[in-house]
Amino acid sequence: MSGSQSSGSPGSPGPPGPPGRSALVVYGSETGNAQDVAEEVGALAERLHFTTQISELNHVKPESLRSYTIVVFAVSTTGQGDLPANARTFWRSLLLKKLPPTFLSGVRFTWFGLGDSSYPKFNWAARKLYKRLLQLGADEIYPGGEADHQHSSGLEGTFIPWLAGFRKHLLDKYPLPPGQDPIPDDVQLPPKWVLRLRDQEAASEDVSPPDAMGAAVTGDFPDSYRLDNDHRPLHDSLTATLVQNKRVTPQTHWQDVRHLILTVSDPISYAPGDVLTITPKNTAEDVQSLIEMMGWQEQADQLVSLVPRDSTRSTNELPSPPIHSLDSYPRLTLRELLINYLDIRAIPRRSFFAAIAHYTTYEMHKERLLEFTNPEYLDEFWDYTTRPRRSILEILHEFDTVKIPWQHATSTFPIIRARQFSIASGGELKRTSVGGARFELLIAIVKYRTVIKKIREGVCTKYISNLRPGSTLKIQLQRGGLNSSVGQLVGPTMLIGPGTGVAPLRSMLWEKAAIVKSYQEKNPGVDPPIEPTILVYGGRNRAADFFFEDEWQQLSDLIKLKVLTAFSRDQKQKVYVQDVIRENSSLVFNLLHDKGGAVFVCGSSGRMPQAVRETLTEAFQYGNDAGTQPFSRREAEDYLVGMEKTGRYKQETW
Amino acid sequence: MAPSFVSIDTTPDFDMTPTSSKSADSGKRTLLLAPPSIATQEDKLRTLFTTYDRSTTDLQMLDRVSAGFVSLPANTYDLVLVLTGTDGTRRSEALQLLKREVYAAVVPAMKGGAKLQTEDNFFGEAEDREAVLAGLVKKETGFEKMDVGNGAAVPLRLGRKKKAAPAPAPVVQPPPIISSDDNDLNDDELIDEDTLLSADDLKRPIVPPPECQPKAGKRRRACKDCTCGLAAQIEAEDRERREAADKSLNVMKLESDDLNELDFTVQGKTGSCGNCALGDAFRCDGCPFIGLPAFKPGQEVQILNDVAQL
């Protein structure tokens, strides 16, 4: 691999100052897509002999951007047009008022945004960042790009053409010296971090993980339910104990929905709309099957550690390891690493095919794998992976000549990422009797069929569905996008959340109840100052998936709650939440317009929030039966936009 | 996408905070609460101060009070007037900003018996509620703060300030910050990120524009939120394909609930292309084995409950 000294500039180990040809690729990623984009951009730069660093935004300082030849930002949008959590520290440091307009002069950047056009604030995070970078004097050297999750070819549909253009730009503006060529795609870029066996003797002194037997909870659970403890030193995480894992839909119903209760010993507080993240694990069976396929039986249960491949490189040049704080995992074996960290059930990205093509010598397999990485075969790639939801494990079964060196496991497989779940508890449900925090979740277990015979299962919900109460999990608490103020909680509200979308709304309803109760305690006999709430709920059948029906009864008097329901399969004609809103348009108009109420829309992204938005606009147009002049279409639309601007229309969909 | 070159002004946009509270107890003090748009109309402001004596009158911007940027002196004002315009021209703007946070800041700054009024003498339902919640009493024109001593107003304390009174259940606490959000930067020192984008940005097309049209010869895909029926069509195709595949397998005596064995080395039972055994990545469009794992020629395949067991 003669061309592969690309990134090391081995001849000149001089000071880390601005090297002649360096690239920094930074990302703000919530679900991992922006990180994938960053990694693909990074690989491209490295192949063009840029000394390349890839990092999450929170790990870089704005002041350091200047020292790179080029900086590429890959940023997704979350919440109400916000930057992802792992970019917000950086972002806030850019928002400082005192920064002069020359603060970033000399910084040469481009950017790529990832968004979902079913959100009104499509790609706002990237656009805000772009504007702020310009305000602070940075130079956009290549026009940014934007990907849309709703695009028919997914993110790739816009990313691939953008990347091709950027590559051309780099070659034009930063030509390679005569005699030097880009590293071809079929030459593997050596991984920066590799696994090494640890000295087993010395390592034996490590503390072994605490006994898995915690407070065992008895009860009737299928054998598939296991008691599991989570030992991962995950960033900013809390150890939670699962105290309930209850199926709330009938066994006969097509969908398995779980009502989970988790407790934490610390008195953590949270607000409606906040989100809990859970990082799943792989099953022991899947990992065993991978170990056998790869022929790793000999190393599987030996202690390993993650080390830089090239220990001579200065730490400045060394990108951060693919997994953080792995050192503090108690007695890490290859098997534990596979179970806890590597996403072997992920739907692979194109870069995965490029990586594993290096690990087979069987021409037929190699050729096909490389075809899948070719943008011209995007359709076939999509038909083979995303469309049928084919996992890495299944692909390795099929391409069984691929033998990944175990040392490269962390650079070949994606890292298991955390999944977000809206918290369903609020008010008095937020605390345990002994002063700890309590979290409730409502989770639909993901199972579906594609053209692949074997039923598809969601990695995280499968992990959750088999946990026996008493198990521990590492959870992270994140602030959500609903940001309902106390004023909004006691004010008139319209809550729209079909299916498990009702979770964050339930949190709000219990929060309202707690406000009313505490007011009543202090002012006995006085009518609590609470305005009416309309909950619009939708499901398939009242009998099967009307979650928390009893609670709504219980809460309705306390907080002036009116529940409107739409059960699509309970009558011949399908009825959805938007239909119920339409039927009640004057009620809606009165609550939202006359009373100045706020709307919260939660649930699946895509069609539902769009239909709701449309129906609300219509309600503003036609719902005014007070006889005053009706809104025109334009005015109704403007009114909705106005609500959005003033935080009276909030959407949290997933 | 014209680069908007904005230098950042760090001075408060409209600073007329009480210069000192020396005259706090001499004469009647008035607090004017203005919607931000008034700041652009100097003449309007000048007229105001002909009506209200500058020396006993403070002006605050509603949005700044609402955002908690302003601390008002306690028990100081006899009149708080919301500048809705005498003809109500600024009513909607002003009232929109007259939120709970404003009451929380303003009511303690009012003397006992002080009045809260709007220029056009209008209070909507929402304002009424908030004012009452804040412990004010409705009067003919606006609201009044009860004199302490004769009948105490009961302000609804909804968290926020949790110093006094050991509340039995802390109802609202600041949201937890466990994510990496917690730098030490005060919001005060930051620009408002929402000002970075305008309404035009909302409408800005995606760059580069999406190529939704299918390319010639390429299979068409449905968008994630497909409404045109393509998604359903594709799903139906997939189902059909799966069923067709099931059927072809059954022709070869592979009942899905039977434990059947199939020897792929037997003539006529393997696809003519010879690629079937390699897996979906190599199978052709109508392959009956689509969706089944790869197998070795000669390997026994059992189909148990619709799942191939290799």
Swiss-Prot record, chain A:
One of its GO terms (molecular function) is oxidoreductase activity. Keywords: Cytoplasm, FAD, Flavoprotein, FMN, Mitochondrion, NADP, Oxidoreductase. GO terms for biological process: cellular response to oxidative stress; iron-sulfur cluster assembly; nitric oxide biosynthetic process; positive regulation of nitric oxide biosynthetic process. Its EC number is 1.18.1.-. Residues 1-22 are annotated as: Disordered. FMN binds at residues 29-34, 76-79, 114-123. The keyword Translocase does not apply. GO terms for cellular component: cytosol; cytosolic [4Fe-4S] assembly targeting complex; mitochondrion. Residues 235-485 form the FAD-binding FR-type domain. InterPro entries: CysJ-like_FAD-binding, FAD-bd_FR_type, Flavdoxin-like, Flavodoxin/NO_synth, Flavoprot_Pyr_Nucl_cyt_Rdtase, Flavoprotein-like_sf, FNR_nucleotide-bd, NADPH_Cyt_P450_Rdtase_alpha. SUPFAM superfamilies: Ferredoxin reductase-like, C-terminal NADP-linked domain, Flavoproteins, Riboflavin synthase domain-like. Residues 1-10 have a biased composition (Low complexity). Its cofactor is FAD; FMN. This is NADPH-dependent diflavin oxidoreductase 1. The gene is tah18.
From Swiss-Prot, chain B:
Residues 155-202 are annotated as: Linker. It comes from the Eukaryota. Residues 212-228 are annotated as: Fe-S binding site A. A motif (Cx2C motif 1) lies at residues 273-276. [4Fe-4S] cluster binds at residues 273, 276, 284, 287. Residues 273-287 are annotated as: Fe-S binding site B. It is found in: Cytoplasm; Mitochondrion intermembrane space. Disulfide bonds: none annotated. [2Fe-2S] cluster binds at residues 212, 223, 226, 228. Keywords: 2Fe-2S, 4Fe-4S, Cytoplasm, Iron, Iron-sulfur, Metal-binding, Mitochondrion. The keyword Membrane does not apply. A motif (Cx2C motif 2) lies at residues 284-287. One of its GO terms (molecular function) is metal ion binding. It holds the Pfam family CIAPIN1. Residues 167-177 have a biased composition (Pro residues). InterPro entries: Anamorsin, CIAPIN1, Dre2_N. One of its GO terms (biological process) is iron-sulfur cluster assembly. Its cofactor is [2Fe-2S] cluster; [4Fe-4S] cluster. One of its GO terms (cellular component) is mitochondrial intermembrane space. Residues 24-154 are annotated as: N-terminal SAM-like domain. Monomer. Interacts with tah18. Interacts with mia40. Belongs to the anamorsin family. Component of the cytosolic iron-sulfur (Fe-S) protein assembly (CIA) machinery required for the maturation of extramitochondrial Fe-S proteins. Part of an electron transfer chain functioning in an early step of cytosolic Fe-S biogenesis, facilitating the de novo assembly of a [4Fe-4S] cluster on the scaffold complex cfd1-nbp35. Electrons are transferred to dre2 from NADPH via the FAD- and FMN-containing protein tah18. The C-terminal domain binds 2 Fe-S clusters but is otherwise mostly in an intrinsically disordered conformation. This is Fe-S cluster assembly protein dre2.
